Amino acid sequence: MSVPLILTILAGAATFIGAFLGVLGQKPSNRLLAFSLGFAAGIMLLISLMEMLPAALAAEGMSPVLGYGMFIFGLLGYFGLDRMLPHAHPQDLMQKSVQPLPKSIKRTAILLTLGISLHNFPEGIATFVTASSNLELGFGIALAVALHNIPEGLAVAGPVYAATGSKRTAILWAGISGLAEILGGVLAWLILGSMISPVVMAAIMAAVAGIMVALSVDELMPLAKEIDPNNNPSYGVLCGMSVMGFSLVLLQTVGIG
């Protein structure tokens, strides 16, 4: 099994961490969740804008028009799909109301699972493609995706457990969204692995960079602010950028990058 595929599987499996937290009742503080989402956004933004997009534009045979065009395509494609697909957001379920209605909250959790699954599928492809092109960047993207999958698993498992009383059912529903990400990585491994050219890989990387930027500014940062309105998510973003930037410099210094 390839290392990029293993990274994709591990990133998707992080959903189960949130699921177990949801059924065990040991919910992390809103401040910690918000910081982790901002941290993940910082990692994605730095890797996308400072590494992936420049690398795609510098690839042999890649024209600036195609490179920037694919980046914009990734941006607009994410926003378009996000607006077209009706789904609840994780913060809607993480905020516990007094005596929630079991049937209503279960239906909302199922809709959330569907929405997260559809949105996680391309994330799996993005993680695999990035790691295949540059393993160093793949580790960073896998870490960022894993951090943002934990509250997603928590957001689904907690309400389903409250509605059904079944830990197994709650973990199952939460795990489906993580499995969708793994499926995306497996399909990318099967379809793209042997027949992709350097130019096509660079074009996909540019589009993935656009998707990651859109995900960071449209989903992760606003979600962090909604989960913890009293703190600025920018601190998490800056920490994520700093840690990722330092790690990239360190890896390049020792000759890994």
From Swiss-Prot:
Taxonomic lineage from the root: Bacteria, Pseudomonadati, Pseudomonadota, Gammaproteobacteria, Enterobacterales
Alphabetized UniProt keyword annotations: Cell inner membrane, Cell membrane, Ion transport, Iron, Membrane, Metal-binding, Transmembrane, Transmembrane helix, Transport, Zinc, Zinc transport
Principal location: membrane
Source organism: Escherichia coli O81 (strain ED1a)
TM helices/strands, residue ranges: 5-25, 32-52, 61-81, 137-157, 171-191, 195-215, 236-256
Main function: Mediates zinc uptake. May also transport other divalent cations.
Binding sites annotated in the UniProt record for Zn(2+): 123, 148, 152
Protein name: Zinc transporter ZupT
Pfam families per UniProt: Zip
Molecular function GO labels: metal ion binding; zinc ion transmembrane transporter activity
